Amino acid sequence: AATIDRAVDIYAEMLARDDVTNLFGLAGAMVPTGMRAIVADLIRDGHIDALVTTGANLTHDAIEAIGGKHHHGRADPHDPHPAGDDGGGGGSGTAREHDETLRDEGVDRIYNVYLPQEHFALFESHLRDNVFPTVERRVSIQEFTSALGRANAAQNEERDVDEDSGIAAAAYENDVPIYCPAI
């Protein structure tokens, strides 16, 4: 508890100072697991000056911005507690059989988060139709992620998507650079 108290004090001091640049690192499957809105809000509220993230997080952010959905459920057929469930029994079969069934159904799994493969095709079309035409020359990572954020925001509004336009859009709208070594 003392360590958390100290961390909160340091964070509060950091936010109060104008001479501090706040870098935010976002690694792992944070967007699929539900952290997308929190990070976008931190950007919009001025708490992040630069974002360092993975290509996977930007991919999943764009998928949700243009209407794709991540679904939370069981990690494997023997998991007795799917997300949002307070009990019940597990499924049948082995974890391998579960993954093979998902593959046959065109569904990708990130532990207990599921995403239909068709959403990746939608993302690729989004890149081809809305992002790549605006970056017809070699550009920096920041220019590319800015174009991605602009396109995500535009498509989110045009398609009237229920989900927020997301991290890349918030960064674009607030002039927050994104550094992504994978791009």
Residue ranges with predicted function:
Residues 1-121, 125, 133, 144-162, ...:
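Metallocofactor- and cofactor-centric catalytic cores in central/energy metabolism, strongly enriched
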Residues 132-138:
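Short, compositionally biased low-complexity segments
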